């Protein structure tokens, strides 16, 4: 299973659903994408989990991103960057089995492939703040970022 390919698949489907405004069944959309772009079967469950988790927690994720992305509203961000930040934030906030640094590195590489020339730096800066805020909350028990 390629986790990066699963992340890319989840990103593509989240992007597509947001851009088209479709309320298509998420799993169907992922399987359709996987069939069309020859995504290995082993990558699909992780892609489904990421996309579903991101959509389930979108309101909390967006709230947290708005707090941490000084000078940038989500609406002002490039569509790819916004959806990639949501996806990576889901991992950081809700998937404690994946180290934050791994998530950030993966997001930067995906941003380089799908985003603009500046996307990698932009994504890195905001996700560093997400990880830092989560770490502060874990250490001090304060409520810098909400997870639910």
Swiss-Prot record:
Matching entries from Pfam families are given as:
NusB
Instruction: Tell me the InterPro entries matching this sequence.
Output: NusB-like_sf (IPR035926), NusB_fam (IPR011605), NusB_RsmB_TIM44 (IPR006027)
Q: Which domain of life is it from?
A: Bacteria
Q: Which controlled-vocabulary keywords does the entry list?
A: RNA-binding, Transcription, Transcription antitermination, Transcription regulation
Task: Name residues in a coiled coil.
Answer: none
- The answer to whether keyword Transcription regulation applies is yes
What molecular function does GO assign, one term?
A: RNA binding
GO annotation, biological process: DNA-templated transcription termination; transcription antitermination
Cell wall biogenesis/degradation found in the keyword field: no
| Gene Ontology annotations for the cellular component aspect, listed alphabetically | cytosol
Q: Which family does it belong to?
A: Belongs to the NusB family.
Biological role: Involved in transcription antitermination. Required for transcription of ribosomal RNA (rRNA) genes. Binds specifically to the boxA antiterminator sequence of the ribosomal RNA (rrn) operons.
This chain belongs to the protein called Transcription antitermination protein NusB
